[in-house]
Design a protein with these regions (language model features):
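Juxtamembrane interface at the cytosolic side of transmembrane helices
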Residues: 193-237
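Extended, solvent-exposed segments with strong compositional bias
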Residues: 25, 33, 98-151
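C-terminal interaction-tip segments
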Residues: 174-204
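Extended low-complexity, serine/threonine- and proline-enriched intrinsically disordered segments
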Residues: 63, 71-119, 174-180
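Hydrophobic membrane-insertion alpha-helices, especially the h-region
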Residues: 2-23, 211-212
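Extracellular and analogous surface-interaction loops
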Residues: 41-56, 145-156
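Alpha-helical transmembrane signal-anchor/signal-peptide segments
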Residues: 23-44, 175-182
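Extended, hydrophilic extramembrane loops/domains of integral membrane proteins
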Residues: 149-185
C-alpha cells in the first residue's frame, strides 16, 4: 500500500509538471499580438510578440464597422465577392489600398491588404498578403504568395510602417493584429499534438484536479490512521 501511495503521488506530480509545461508552450504558441495603428503614410509602430516556433507573419487590420452588407459592398473596405481565375482571384470591390512595410531581423517586405474577409460584432477585418507591385488593384494571387519574411522563435519586435493608404481610410485608427503560429482552424504541422489542447485542455485540467482531490483524501485517511495507531501505542505503553 505504501508503494502504491507514493507512486500515485509521484505520478500526480509528474503529470502536473508535464501539463504545466505543455500549457506554457500552448500559451506562447497561441499568443496574439495587436496594437492600434494610425492609417497615415509614414506612421510607424513596433509590434512585440512571442513565438514558440519559427513561422511566417500573418497580419490583419480590424476596423470598427457594422457587419458588411453584401448587396451594397463598402468601396472603402472592400468585399470578398470574387471570380476565380488561373492563379489569382479578381475582386469586384477590392477596397482602398493599404500597404505596410514589415521589418524584422535586418530584412523587410511589403504587404498589401485584401478586401474584408471576416466580421464580428461591430468590426470587420482585412487580412494582408505579400505585395505584388505589378498586379492590378482588383487581382490577388491565389493561393497567396509565400511570405518573404520568416519570424524566429522567442520574443520578437517587428517594425511596421504605413507605406500607402487610400484617401477614404486616411486618419482612421485600426487594430493591427499578428496571428499566432498555432490557431484553432489553421496551424503549422510542426506544432504536432499541441493543437489538441484546444479541445482537451479543460478535460485534462479537470481530471488532474480530481486526481489531486483523491490523493489529498487518501493522504488524510492515511494520516488519520497513523495518528490513531500512534495514540494507541502511547496508551498501551
Amino acid at each position: 500500500v505504501r508503494i502504491a501511495f507514493w507512486s500515485s503521488w509521484l505520478l500526480l506530480i509528474s503529470l502536473s509538471i508535464g501539463l504545466a509545461l505543455a500549457l506554457a508552450d500552448f500559451r506562447t504558441a497561441t499568443h496574439y499580438a495587436s496594437a492600434p495603428l494610425l492609417l497615415e503614410p509614414g506612421t510607424q509602430l513596433t509590434l512585440e510578440t512571442e513565438r514558440l516556433l519559427p513561422g511566417r507573419p500573418q497580419l490583419s487590420l480590424t476596423f470598427q464597422r457594422p457587419p458588411p452588407d453584401y448587396d451594397q459592398p463598402d468601396p472603402v473596405l472592400g468585399n470578398w465577392q470574387n471570380s476565380q481565375h488561373a492563379g489569382f482571384l479578381r475582386f469586384r470591390t477590392p477596397g482602398e489600398p493599404i500597404r505596410l512595410k514589415v521589418e524584422h531581423d535586418g530584412r523587410h517586405a511589403i504587404y498589401r491588404a485584401m478586401p474584408v474577409s471576416s466580421h464580428g460584432s461591430g468590426e470587420v477585418t482585412r487580412e494582408f498578403t505579400p505585395d505584388e507591385p505589378s498586379a492590378s488593384p482588383t487581382d490577388f494571387q491565389w493561393p497567396p504568395l509565400a511570405s518573404p519574411l520568416t519570424l524566429g522563435a522567442g520574443n520578437l519586435h517587428l517594425k511596421i510602417t504605413v507605406v500607402e493608404v487610400g484617401p477614404g481610410l486616411r486618419g482612421e485608427t485600426a487594430t493591427l493584429g499578428l496571428e499566432p503560429g498555432l490557431q484553432m482552424k489553421v496551424t503549422d504541422a510542426d506544432y504536432g499534438w499541441l493543437w489538441l489542447l484546444f479541445i482537451v485542455k479543460p478535460a485534462l485540467q479537470l481530471l488532474l484536479a480530481l486526481y489531486a482531490v483523491v490523493m489529498l483524501a487518501w493522504s488524510w485517511r492515511r494520516g488519520r490512521t497513523w495518528w490513531r495507531g500512534r495514540a494507541g501505542a502511547v496508551k498501551a505503553s
